[in-house]
Amino acid sequence: MSTGAQALLRTLVDGGVRTVFTNPGTSEMHFVQALDGAPEMRAVLALFEGVATGAADGYARMAGTPGATLLHLGSGLGNGVANLHNARKGKSPIVNIVGDHATYHTQYDAQLQSDIETVARNVSPGFVRTSASTAQLGQDAAEAIAAAQGPPGQVATLILPADVSWSEGGSAAKVPERAAPPRASEETVQRLAGLIRGGKPGDTALLLGGRALRRDTLMLAGRVSTAAGTRLLAEVFPARIERGAGLPPVERLAYLAELASVQLRGIKHLILVDSKSPVSFFAYPGKASDLVPDGCEVHTLAAPDEDVLGSLDALVEALGAANAQPLLQEASRPKPPTGPLTAEKVCQAVAAAMPENAIVSDEAQTSGLTFASVSAGVPAHDVLTLTGGAIGQGLPVAVGAAVACPDRPVIALEADGSAMYTLQALWTMAREGLDVTVVLFNNRSYGILNIELQRTGAGEAGPVAKSQLDLSTPQMDFVQLALGLGVPARRVATGEDLTDALEHALAEPGPHLIETVVPSTVTGARLKVMPYALNALAKLPLPVARAIKGKLAP
């Protein structure tokens, strides 16, 4: 007879969940002890719950199978919520296991007692369950795995009371078989094909998200584009996008709503493929939240719970585009930069050094604005982005990606302020010997908030307001921080030194951190002028507006 913890682990392993990212406490000790009896399960320790949840997200994005977490009570879940929020927005499959007090102990309202289910529903709206008995635990776990897998993928939270975990009487359960997701109806496919055929080149755009940004689906979208002149756009922050030489180029919508509106202007029909209709990230005084241009109709080819690949394939057939050759990105690579570093030069150096089949975890914020353009033609790679906007994702997601794909180099482009949210991820990289190169942009400010302060029209910033966006006093030393967490690190100030550091880090196994001290991307007069330039875009002729957009966010 198995304990509940043993039955839970066996259900996870048999259900294809082979990695759990943990930050356990007393309530989870029986699960921890049971790990030795499940050698197929890899347990990866994190020093902070936000690292564990972000790593499970990165793992799920790259493995394509659920990652699991082990968290301690409601407070532990609370510490991990930000990156579970990102996972929810990215539709990542995660089995989120949260330990709880023994069922008979909750009545005493001990110090760590809390309403875990209420906290969990913020990030697991589709599946939250407290397992009420050891006999039922295996089945609860199997249903959590099925829920996490989707489609679409989701965070499924399973709450594990301590006595349910330690008691005898558990048995493993089989994950229910998933029905194949439906593809778009024939009526939908034919209607959209008719709209595409009836328009002029550029009138119609496919807005791709989720699974539509993988190689197979991109090739199909590329055929549609070649055959009909349809534009290919991607959501602002994709969970995972495959890009680079030999793949169809896709234009990501800009973060700033004014720039995204320029990209969308002129489109008559916007077709969603595993994506949502575009909206601004925040509300701004006097500005619309809905970014769909006037006169544009929004259609859905495939929703997140539908067969994206099959739906695109059906559209290709309906257009007679099966033999159309998609436009592919030509191979190109920038030259390594020289001289004093800027954020643009750091992006250039990374692109110049990018190895084949790399994975990029991008949380560079304003410092990484030029990375997409300078890396467009480098060898094919994956980019993982900040799906839910909750910063502190970049380093943990890099951990998970490296665990999922140990044979692929991982590069984390990380802003200084964001890094400090989950810096403990460096320790896990060192402990696990993960092949992650962290390129740290230290501009000593919350650069994006300086821009937002101007855009929101909040008025002239005084010394107190400015101090809230300044990270220069005291100066953070990321080399010493990394060394203290077991990661080799160096600071560079020139393009030549950065190129040398990248070559060394990418050639030597294990984690490395390279700190680049760079000026903020948008400062001074450029920062003052930016809101006026952004507001003027809607009134400018489209070619002029697009040229300005290309300068601000290439």
Predicted regions mapped to residue ranges:
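Active-site diphosphate/adenylate-binding microenvironment
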Residues: 5-18, 23-26, 31-38, 327-407, ...
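Short acidic loop-to-helix transition motifs that present clustered carboxylates
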Residues: 28, 49-54, 77, 367-369, ...
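A short acidic, amphipathic alpha-helical/loop segment
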Residues: 34, 82-83, 216-223, 349, ...
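Short, glycine-/Ser/Thr-/acidic-enriched flexible segments
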Residues: 76, 102, 163-165, 211-213, ...
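Thiamine diphosphate
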Residues: 97, 105-114, 227, 370-554
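Phosphate/pyrophosphate-binding active-site segments
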Residues: 135, 159, 274-368, 464, ...
